[in-house]
């Protein structure tokens, strides 16, 4: 129902991956939105071998494959699960530099594009530590349509350095995790939670959340009573960058969906607010200070 609600609220871009639920994420899109195929844009990802029957060790990363035969096979399987004959955006999932440097991969993607099975291709970079080289190489050396990155008020590096390169090379950036693991939604304002075992946040030490909430306290000036919530401010922050063409928030209920989609109707981040955010970022959000300190503007 939420996916149908999303379309009703004006959302037409849906991002998934073959590895989400071992294909279940793609199947859900087909089941719920298949009848609206011509009205929506579907992006999915490839690169992890979800077809290997070897049991996984906890949250250990799956083996990746980007050879010609695997990519073609993965594409066919995604098309089948999505119930469609074309994918709007096909993204190499968490691809490493060595695979980015292989021409065969991009020749394969161009062939899939020529055959009409995909319309555009790009990369989904991450996680947020250790993909500077991948991002810079992609944006300057490969003719991709898009690059998906993690970018938010709280997590700006290394995506911040990609913004100029994306604009110069006419690559659209897709920003995921705009609410920084929900620290910018108000979910944790009443105290530290206990995460379910299958929640990726449960595998971090509590210190990350304690520090994050100190940072959130420093940016509460963004909230405008009755006109812009913190969650909406977080979306406006991301969309202030012209090279970011879409933001990909997670939502789990209708209230969140309506709040996020209405973010575009709220006041944009002003230049003064942006200057304050830039200074806070430069100084680590002044988490050691009792109150945020700003230079005169």
PLM feature spans:
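N-terminal binding-site loop/beta-alpha segment at the start of enzyme catalytic domains
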Residues: 1-44
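N-terminal small/glycine-rich loop or linker at the start of catalytic domains
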Residues: 43-62, 89-91
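Beta/alpha (TIM)-barrel catalytic core signal, keyed to glycine-rich beta->alpha loops juxtaposed to Asp/Glu
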Residues: 96-280, 284-286, 294-297
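Glycine-centered flexible beta-alpha turn that most often forms the glycine-rich phosphate-binding loop
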Residues: 14, 87, 121
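Short, acidic/polar
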Residues: 1-6, 66-82, 128-137
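Acidic (Asp/Glu)-rich catalytic clusters
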Residues: 8, 31-41, 79-83, 107-113, ...
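Active-site mouth loops of central-metabolism enzymes
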Residues: 57-70, 94-98
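Active-site groove signature of glycoside hydrolases
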Residues: 79-98
């Amino acid at each position: 129902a939420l996916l149908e609600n999303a379309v009703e609220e004006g959302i037409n871009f849906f991002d998934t991956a073959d590895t989400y639920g071992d294909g279940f994420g793609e199947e859900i899109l087909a089941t719920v939105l298949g009848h609206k195929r011509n009205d929506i844009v579907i992006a999915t990802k490839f690169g992890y071998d979800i077809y290997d029957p070897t049991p996984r060790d906890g949250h250990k990363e799956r083996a990746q494959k980007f050879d010609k035969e695997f990519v073609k096979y993965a594409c066919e399987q995604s098309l089948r699960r999505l119930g469609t004959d074309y994918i709007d955006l096909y993204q190499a999932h968490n691809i490493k530099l060595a695979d980015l440097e292989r021409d065969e991969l991009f020749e394969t993607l161009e062939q899939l594009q020529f055959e009409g099975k995909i319309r555009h291709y790009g990369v989904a970079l991450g996680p947020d530590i250790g993909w500077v080289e991948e991002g810079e190489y992609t944006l300057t050396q490969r003719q991709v349509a898009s690059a998906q990155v993690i970018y938010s008020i709280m997590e700006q590096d290394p995506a911040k350095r990609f913004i100029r390169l994306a604009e110069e090379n006419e690559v659209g950036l897709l920003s995921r995790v705009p609410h920084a693991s929900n620290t910018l939604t108000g979910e944790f304002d009443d105290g530290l939670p206990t995460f379910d075992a299958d929640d990726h946040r449960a595998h971090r030490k509590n210190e990350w959340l304690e520090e994050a909430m100190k940072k959130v306290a420093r940016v509460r000036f963004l909230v405008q009573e009755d006109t812009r919530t913190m969650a909406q401010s977080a979306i406006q922050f991301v969309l202030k960058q012209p090279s970011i063409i879409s933001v990909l928030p997670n939502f789990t209920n209708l209230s969140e969906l309506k709040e996020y989609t209405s973010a575009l109707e709220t006041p944009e981040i002003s230049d003064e607010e942006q200057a304050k955010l830039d200074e806070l970022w430069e100084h680590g959000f002044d988490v050691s200070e009792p109150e945020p300190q700003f230079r005169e503007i």
